[in-house]
């Protein structure tokens, strides 16, 4: 009977450690989800700023007049 009791206690100990590990992993997932949400918000802000930028007054290479030949 002692062997069965030891096995039960060992299983209970393992279960307690697994529950702790699951909780720690859950907290990490929550942190990562918050980080992802923050980064997505930052990306949306950057997209908005890029779209709001006015075009440059500098001519592109295609629009530039070719230099005179010597």
Swiss-Prot record:
What superkingdom heads the lineage? Bacteria
Species of origin = Shewanella sp. (strain MR-4)
* Pfam families, per the entry: SlyX
Q: Which residues form the signal peptide?
A: none
Q: What's the protein here called?
A: Protein SlyX homolog
Q: What family is it from?
A: Belongs to the SlyX family.
């Amino acid at each position: 009977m002692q062997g069965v009791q030891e096995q039960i206690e060992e299983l209970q100990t393992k279960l307690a450690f697994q529950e702790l590990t699951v909780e720690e992993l859950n907290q990490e997932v929550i942190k990562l989800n918050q980080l992802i949400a923050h980064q997505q918000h930052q990306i949306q802000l950057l997209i908005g700023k890029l779209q709001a930028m006015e075009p440059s007054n500098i001519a592109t290479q295609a629009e530039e007049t070719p230099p005179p030949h010597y």
